[in-house]
């Protein structure tokens, strides 16, 4: 660690101490040396003793800067780890920082594009339209030399030196995270190193704007010609690692309820479409925008009777596999049916909790946490909080962290919050139920079986030519096993007093042959032979019994 990093580490610790964050260090013999060092090296007291811990932590992170602000924002979504009061305070962190110089932004963009801006654009505004911790945006329009002459665009450019700043602070975060489990028993449950690793992946992805471009193009294609969602066009020839250029959009911020109502927006349909957009992304596309906070969502002011969302900033996305979607759909349906045993089994069958989990205890834990939720009408139940409760219980039974589901739960809370802000009477269950039922109907039952058979047909056809040889090998092996069984039976006639041992020997040889075939032969060969073996086994046991009678 160099002098610069040491100075930064000192500043971080000093800031945490000024806000009294060290109160989480327990007063036990193990931490005595740390507490003595704290008093010797840092002559600073908690300057906000009357503020709750959550408020002090939020203020400390805000003061430490962009990287720590975004960490706090991410932690605010991990309500399976933190108390609601603390998570609520972290959610108040604002990723809004002063813009860097517009002339520097121009120079960075020109370096990325390889020429002066005037070659492609007119009216570049050096005053940033918006500025955040990672990047800021400027507006311009295509000049007369371009096919889209006069089209307004937004140019997004990374902050200078941001990658170095982030990597330096991440290294310090890892160091601090490694200390937490040693200082506090509760810290081990939080798995701080794992949390920082998850945060690092998300943050480093945001440092390559080309990934945002790819995500936006994919989302735009998924909702092409959709009345529900519009995603601005990306101009790929102008997109680079630190600069992207996209279509400029005009819309009403989704949080501006008064303006939406003044525009005559159908608020009920708007709220329902928010839920529909989310579940369409999850169950149809397996790909969802995972940063759908109010600052990234607008409403098209045209056709307010048929409202359309506009989504921007696709830097953070989530993807789901079939196992994830099955877990979600079946867990939600089982929850609303109050089938907590099925919920418990889903976690084990998914491989997310250990196979030796006590299902009875797991079921009862879900019942204790989830049953009180039904004190509310179904229409008022939050899917996001249902998932949160499931995760909270599952973590106590050693569920592995599933980052894609954490992202999904965070996004679901955003969508639900916005939906009920737009239309307080929104019935989430009735809006989401068709998506869950349609997906489950598509995935289980005869249709799903027939689809799987059709998909596997080329594989069956490819291996069909191998059938005669495989069958010949299997029969040869079966002859050897039968011969050995006959030898054993002859030998057992001389051991009539050891009936238990003899039967076990017969059973063992048969089972060994069975396992060999399942491991070495195609399924369509080994299954018929398994039937033959069981008949031989029954015959052997019968023969053995007759010998002893």
From Swiss-Prot:
Pathway: Cofactor biosynthesis; ubiquinone biosynthesis [regulation]. The keyword Transmembrane helix applies. The chain crosses the membrane at residues 505-525. Keywords: ATP-binding, Cell inner membrane, Cell membrane, Kinase, Membrane, Nucleotide-binding, Transferase, Transmembrane, Transmembrane helix, Ubiquinone biosynthesis. Pfam families: ABC1. ATP binds at residues 129-137, 156. This is Probable protein kinase UbiB. It comes from Glaesserella parasuis serovar 5 (strain SH0165) (Haemophilus parasuis). The gene is ubiB.
